[in-house]
Regions:
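N-terminal glycine-rich dinucleotide-binding loop that anchors FAD/FMN and/or NAD(P) in oxidoreductases
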Residues: 42-81, 121-137, 186-191, 214-235
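Feature captures the FAD/FMN-dependent oxidoreductase FAD-binding
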Residues: 4-6, 13, 59-115, 210-211, ...
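Rossmann-like dinucleotide/flavin-binding elements
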Residues: 1-43, 84, 99-100, 111-212
Length: 235
């Protein structure tokens, strides 16, 4: 295709798309609304990623560097698509930074937003300082400061991880499974136990859905090697 391809979103999917296109000689225009590339893993301060175990800043940082240095990728950060019109093979795009470009196709890789746990007040998030989200724990780990109780900075002796908060829940109109939270939680539990071997970690679950090869690597390993306790319950 002689015209560049528009990519909306500079997270992992958008970065992978830009790199894949460049490998076959196809130019692209990547538009990201944040002031930097990387998406949720970078902007939210993720720790180690599943299933590779790489630190987010290293894995995603490598993807960002590869795209930024590629002459076939034109990057626009702190920008949005203001206008998009035309027909397949001939679209006109106006970017909020003033750039106008003609593209042949568009790839939407706009990412996601984390569930706001304030919408499940029964678990005390937003009321009790030591009730935190997975993302907040990820930030504690990735900062290098370790997992601590926000209320007073002490090392926790017991941690309960509640699964399916914000998913598989008809009361809030979210009946679907996220497909990744069980695995992420098992990984997080192992990270907590690795840092705090005297801390007891409990995972409360409806069903464990560690899809594919994740069952052995995360579900069973977290129990057998790290002694994480799983408790079946309807939270």
């Amino acid at each position: 295709m002689s015209k560049p391809i528009l990519i909306v979103g500079g997270g992992p999917a958008g970065l992978a798309a830009a790199h894949a296109l460049a490998r076959v000689g196809q130019s692209s225009v990547l538009v990201e609304k944040a002031d930097r590339l990387g998406g949720a893993p970078i902007l939210s301060g993720y720790a180690k990623l599943v299933p590779t175990g790489e630190w987010a800043k290293d894995a995603i940082g490598g993807m960002v560097d590869r795209v930024i240095k590629d002459p076939l990728v034109e990057v626009h950060t702190s920008a949005r698509v203001d206008a998009f019109s035309g027909n397949p093979g001939a679209f006109s795009v106006r970017v909020s930074d003033g750039r106008a470009v003609e593209v042949g196709a568009a790839i939407l890789a706009t990412g996601f937003t984390h569930f706001d746990s304030v919408n499940k007040p029964e678990w005390g998030f937003g009321t009790f300082p030591d009730v935190v989200t997975t993302t907040q724990v990820e930030q504690m780990i990735s900062s290098g400061k370790g997992v601590r109780c926000p209320s007073d900075g002490r090392k926790p002796k017991r941690v309960a991880i509640l699964l399916c908060v914000g998913s598989r829940d008809r009361q809030i109109g979210r009946e679907w499974c996220s497909k990744i939270c069980c695995t992420v939680s098992a990984n997080m539990a192992m990270e907590i136990r690795e840092e705090l071997p005297d801390c007891h970690v409990y995972i409360y679950y409806m069903d464990i859905r560690t899809y594919g090869l994740y069952e052995t690597k995360y579900y069973w390993r977290s129990q057998e090697e790290f002694k994480v306790k799983y408790i079946k319950a309807r939270i």
